[in-house]
């Protein structure tokens, strides 16, 4: 089980990323625009740098909903590989079963 502080930190990052997504996209659009002047691009760049660091979506880490494990998480289920296996064996995941051939 992951430390609860790490889980809460990730939740905070997800909220910040969602909150600043529109602003961040608008500034990035200005930076990648061919029509924007050099001064506009510099201004957009400084505004982007002044946004909270945790508002960047690349700082958010997918975690298992049950254990908080940061690696080996299946996006489709939101569970880590160990918890997904346990849930599958208990029959909690509909349509999923152990392979045998």
Curated annotation (Swiss-Prot):
Lineage: superkingdom: Bacteria
Cross-referenced Pfam families, in alphabetical order? Ribosomal_S14 (PF00253)
Name the Gene Ontology biological process terms. translation
GO terms for molecular function, please?
rRNA binding; structural constituent of ribosome
User: Is Ribonucleoprotein given among the entry's keywords?
Assistant: yes
Q: Where is this region: Disordered?
A: 32-65
Q: Which GO terms describe its cellular component?
A: cytoplasm; small ribosomal subunit
- Entry annotated with the keyword Cell cycle: no
- Xref: InterPro entries: Ribosomal_uS14, Ribosomal_uS14_bac/plastid
Alphabetic keyword roster = Ribonucleoprotein, Ribosomal protein, RNA-binding, rRNA-binding
- Describe the family membership recorded for this protein in Swiss-Prot or TrEMBL: Belongs to the universal ribosomal protein uS14 family.
Q: How does it assemble?
A: Part of the 30S ribosomal subunit. Contacts proteins S3 and S10.
The cross-references to HAMAP family, in alphabetical order and at most eight, read: Ribosomal_uS14_1
What does it do? Binds 16S rRNA, required for the assembly of 30S particles and may also be responsible for determining the conformation of the 16S rRNA at the A site.
User: This protein is called what?
Assistant: Small ribosomal subunit protein uS14
* The species this protein was found in: Xanthomonas euvesicatoria pv. vesicatoria (strain 85-10) (Xanthomonas campestris pv. vesicatoria)
């Amino acid at each position: 089980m992951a430390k609860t502080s790490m889980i809460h930190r990730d939740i905070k990052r997800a909220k910040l990323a969602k909150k600043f997504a529109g602003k961040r996209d608008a500034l990035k659009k200005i930076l990648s625009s061919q029509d924007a002047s050099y001064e506009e691009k510099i201004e957009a760049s400084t505004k982007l740098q002044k946004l909270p660091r945790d508002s960047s979506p690349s700082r958010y880490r997918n975690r298992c909903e049950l254990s908080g494990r940061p690696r080996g998480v299946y996006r489709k289920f939101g569970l880590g590989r160990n918890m997904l296996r346990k849930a599958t064996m208990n029959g909690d995941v509909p349509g999923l079963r152990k392979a045998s051939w």
